[in-house]
Amino acid sequence: MTLKGKQITVHDMTLRDGMHPKRHLMTLEQMKTIACGLDAAGVPLIEVTHGDGLGGSSVNYGFPAHSDEQYLSAVIPLVKQAKVSALLLPGIGTVDHLKMAHGLGVHTIRVATHCTEADVSEQHIRFARKLEMDTVGFLMMAHMASPEKLLEQAKLMEGYGANCIYVTDSAGHLLPETVKTRVGAVREALKPETELGFHGHHNLAMGVANSIAAIEAGANRIDAAAAGLGAGAGNTPMEVLIAVCDLMGIATGVDVFKIQDVAEDLVVPIMDFPIRIDRDALTLGYAGVYGSFLLFAKRAEQKYGVPARDILVEMGRRGMVGGQEDMIEDTAMTMARERGRLAA
């Protein structure tokens, strides 16, 4: 199947998913500089919030350097052609957060739930549509649901008013074939006018391949991050995706060389550590574990002497999902006790 001439919308994750490896401590100056670089490179949609979305600032997820309001207020007036989006997880973010984001000029709201819990998104999706926002239903940890279950959940979100649905590989666990079956099933079930997106992680080095597979199966919005800055081994690396799309004749509107410069000159220098597929990030993908668990598991390793890899495998075995970061500490303590590293 040729994709030559196909148009997609690339959605940048550097300033939202990239907050995870930065422990949510990105400065306003870093946000503004990178946002301007992305805007100048032609990226049409840029996500800006705490890594866990609007209202994510907490003991459980981490306290950011600045509030969502401050980050959004700093970035939105600066971008010339790009629109700004925000992520919202019901139960973390509220309708009041949504109103605040809309008031500041956020164009797109992405309402995220676990892939089998679309029903908790109804209030937020309906409210966002009432505000006439570009409203996205974001189904996380998509590897944990069958294609049939996923399309059922996607139709719920579409019914609430979402004009775009995302198949989200939060764990970086899917392979091109499993991406195609899920994205293809959802595409077939949705109305033709409802857009379809894919969000990948690079834990098995499949970010770009999976994104291309998603485009082949009918997705037209694709998430990526400059230099891959994101949870785990990072998001699909934007500069690589853009180069591959260019070679395949897929139109993105993003400048191949300018996005490379953003990645190399602006994003890599602010990394606290290299975003790469180390054994722990690889374990996330292999075991199908939520990407933002990585740093929590590494911290628990330091505290309890249980290897992060073992903790992550156990989290996968227990079927833990996004939002259960507090269980990492609990799991590490239990494992340390069982191994005689901690007094009972």
Swiss-Prot record:
Gene3D superfamilies: 1.10.8.60, Aldolase class I. Substrate binds at residues 16-17, 170, 199, 290. Residues 8-260 form the Pyruvate carboxyltransferase domain. The active site is at 20 (proton acceptor). The record marks 16 as: Transition state stabilizer. Keywords: Aromatic hydrocarbons catabolism, Lyase, Manganese, Metal-binding. It is an enzyme of class 4 (lyase). It comes from Verminephrobacter eiseniae (strain EF01-2). Its EC number is 4.1.3.39. This is 4-hydroxy-2-oxovalerate aldolase. It catalyses: (S)-4-hydroxy-2-oxopentanoate = acetaldehyde + pyruvate. Belongs to the 4-hydroxy-2-oxovalerate aldolase family. GO terms for biological process: catabolic process; L-leucine biosynthetic process. Mn(2+) binds at residues 17, 199, 201. GO terms for molecular function: 2-isopropylmalate synthase activity; 4-hydroxy-2-oxovalerate aldolase activity; manganese ion binding.
